[in-house]
């Protein structure tokens, strides 16, 4: 009797143990021995069906085959459905689309862990693991930025953001047109500077301040891919990416060169429109300056023809060069070289006239010596006139004496005197002057 109860009890316990292994409906807090007899048959059927689908090993002669015994082989695990990564490591839909990622439009385009050096990836609170951007993310490029100023900050100011872990950095807007790329890349460079990456941005000479790391290059590539879709990139950017799709540094370097070129073009146009020349500088230097500006503008695609160039040059002429505006203003076929020939001619004439003039100041003593020497040269003329006056004075005295004594003298003497007054007086001097008495 006891043997029958033990065998029955062992049979029940063995079936319940199998049920606890094969069935998923058994709760962990339930006693595996507390099973009703009506469920034992269901457990046996389930275990039999599972054993029929698996390959069983041949039973040993020492151990009898038990139809209720489950196979010890491990259950097969299905292969991952999304590439080489295991399924339990894949990001769930809720994790991939937290609040704030909807502004990107395509969150699945970020297959990497965000760059951890940037303060934008250190939002307050331990629960935030993804970048949290304000509601302005994804706005058009024409939307004004809340950040003050449009100029770029230097790398030193950008490095100061390393200590601030609560500062949020506004990302660049989405690029929506190839024509907007020059303006978009300025905001992207501003974004990199605010993200503590100002040192990797190429400088004026085309070289960054420091070497970029692999993590920074990954961050650069992914952010560029997110905010600048390939269909909106200019042709020259696509050409660079076709050679190396990760060479974002070359794109930034070329963009900075184009910015500098645009600034130089504007400066050249302003300089050419405000030319001034009056001969104070050599004509060769003035010609070199003007021709270099015109050649640089022509090479950059801004064509300046001879007519426009001559008008701009002549408008800035002053002084002795001003008359060229009136002598040449109707000459439609005049070239810049012909205009500079006239400018050189006037400049050489000015230099020749300046060299012919004395370049020293006369002393007052020299002027006195010159006046004395001039008086000495005229002195013989003064001396020559003195004897004439003395002779004339003597003749007047003689005539007065003759007139006073004419009453006592005979008439013949009076006739001779009257006759002598009508005849010219001969003066013996070296100038041989003939004077009439009536003139004095």
UniProtKB/Swiss-Prot annotation:
<dbReference type="GO" id="GO:0003723">
    <property type="term" value="F:RNA binding"/>
</dbReference>
<dbReference type="Pfam" id="PF01021">
    <property type="entry name" value="TYA"/>
</dbReference>
<feature type="compositionally biased region" description="Polar residues">
    <location>
        <begin position="48"/>
        <end position="60"/>
    </location>
</feature>
<feature type="region of interest" description="Disordered">
    <location>
        <begin position="126"/>
        <end position="173"/>
    </location>
</feature>
<protein>
    <recommendedName>
        <fullName>Transposon Ty1-GR2 Gag polyprotein</fullName>
    </recommendedName>
</protein>
<feature type="compositionally biased region" description="Basic and acidic residues">
    <location>
        <begin position="429"/>
        <end position="440"/>
    </location>
</feature>
<keyword id="KW-0597">Phosphoprotein</keyword>
<dbReference type="InterPro" id="IPR015820">
    <property type="entry name" value="TYA"/>
</dbReference>
<dbReference type="GO" id="GO:0075523">
    <property type="term" value="P:viral translational frameshifting"/>
</dbReference>
<feature type="compositionally biased region" description="Low complexity">
    <location>
        <begin position="153"/>
        <end position="165"/>
    </location>
</feature>
<keyword id="KW-0694">RNA-binding</keyword>
<feature type="modified residue" description="Phosphoserine">
    <location>
        <position position="416"/>
    </location>
</feature>
<comment type="function">
    <text>Capsid protein (CA) is the structural component of the virus-like particle (VLP), forming the shell that encapsulates the retrotransposons dimeric RNA genome. The particles are assembled from trimer-clustered units and there are holes in the capsid shells that allow for the diffusion of macromolecules. CA also has nucleocapsid-like chaperone activity, promoting primer tRNA(i)-Met annealing to the multipartite primer-binding site (PBS), dimerization of Ty1 RNA and initiation of reverse transcription.</text>
</comment>
<feature type="compositionally biased region" description="Polar residues">
    <location>
        <begin position="419"/>
        <end position="428"/>
    </location>
</feature>
<feature type="region of interest" description="Disordered">
    <location>
        <begin position="1"/>
        <end position="93"/>
    </location>
</feature>
<keyword id="KW-0963">Cytoplasm</keyword>
<comment type="subunit">
    <text>Homotrimer.</text>
</comment>
<dbReference type="GO" id="GO:0005737">
    <property type="term" value="C:cytoplasm"/>
</dbReference>
<feature type="region of interest" description="Disordered">
    <location>
        <begin position="352"/>
        <end position="440"/>
    </location>
</feature>
<feature type="compositionally biased region" description="Low complexity">
    <location>
        <begin position="1"/>
        <end position="16"/>
    </location>
</feature>
<feature type="compositionally biased region" description="Polar residues">
    <location>
        <begin position="127"/>
        <end position="152"/>
    </location>
</feature>
<feature type="compositionally biased region" description="Low complexity">
    <location>
        <begin position="402"/>
        <end position="418"/>
    </location>
</feature>
<feature type="region of interest" description="RNA-binding">
    <location>
        <begin position="299"/>
        <end position="401"/>
    </location>
</feature>
<feature type="site" description="Cleavage; by Ty1 protease">
    <location>
        <begin position="401"/>
        <end position="402"/>
    </location>
</feature>
<keyword id="KW-0814">Transposable element</keyword>
């Amino acid at each position: 009797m006891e043997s029958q109860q033990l065998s029955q009890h062992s049979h029940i316990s063995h079936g319940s143990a199998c049920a606890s292994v094969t069935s998923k409906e058994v709760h962990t807090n339930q006693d595996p021995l507390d099973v009703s007899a009506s469920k034992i048959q269901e457990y046996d059927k389930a275990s039999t069906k599972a054993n029929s689908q698996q390959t069983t090993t041949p039973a040993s002669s020492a151990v009898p085959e038990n139809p209720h015994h489950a196979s010890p082989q491990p259950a097969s695990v299905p292969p991952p459905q999304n590439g080489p990564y295991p399924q339990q490591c894949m990001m769930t839909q809720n994790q991939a689309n937290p609040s704030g990622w909807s502004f990107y439009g395509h969150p699945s385009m970020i297959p990497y862990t965000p760059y951890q050096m940037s303060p934008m990836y250190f939002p307050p609170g331990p629960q935030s693991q993804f970048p949290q951007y304000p509601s302005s993310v994804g706005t058009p490029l024409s939307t004004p930025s809340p950040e003050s100023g449009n100029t770029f900050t230097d790398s030193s100011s950008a490095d100061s953001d390393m200590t601030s872990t609560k500062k949020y950095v506004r990302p660049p807007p989405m690029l929506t047109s190839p024509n907007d790329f020059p303006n978009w890349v300025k905001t992207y460079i501003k974004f990199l500077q605010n993200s503590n990456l100002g040192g990797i941005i190429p400088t004026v000479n085309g070289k960054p301040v420091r070497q970029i790391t692999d993590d920074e290059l990954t961050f650069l590539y992914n952010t560029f891919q997110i905010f600048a879709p390939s269909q909106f990139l200019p042709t020259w950017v696509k050409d660079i990416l076709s050679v190396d799709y990760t060479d974002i540094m070359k794109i930034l370097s070329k963009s900075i060169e184009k910015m500098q070129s645009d600034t130089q073009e504007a400066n050249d146009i302003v300089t050419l429109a405000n030319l001034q020349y009056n001969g104070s500088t050599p004509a060769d230097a003035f010609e070199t300056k003007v021709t270099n500006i015109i050649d640089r503008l022509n090479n950059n695609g801004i064509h300046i023809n001879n007519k426009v160039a001559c008008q701009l040059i002549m408008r800035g002429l002053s002084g002795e060069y001003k008359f060229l505006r009136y002598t040449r203003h109707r000459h439609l076929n005049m070239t810049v070289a012909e205009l500079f020939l006239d400018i050189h001619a006037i400049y050489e004439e000015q230099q020749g006239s300046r060299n012919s003039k004395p370049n020293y100041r006369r002393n007052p003593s020299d002027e006195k010596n010159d006046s004395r020497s001039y008086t000495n040269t005229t002195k013989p003329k003064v001396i020559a006139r003195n004897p004439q006056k003395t002779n004339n004075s003597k003749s007047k005295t003689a005539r007065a004496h003759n007139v006073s004594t004419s009453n006592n003298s005979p008439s013949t003497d009076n006739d001779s005197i009257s006759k002598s007054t009508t005849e010219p007086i001969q003066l013996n001097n070296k100038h041989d002057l003939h004077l009439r008495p009536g003139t004095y």
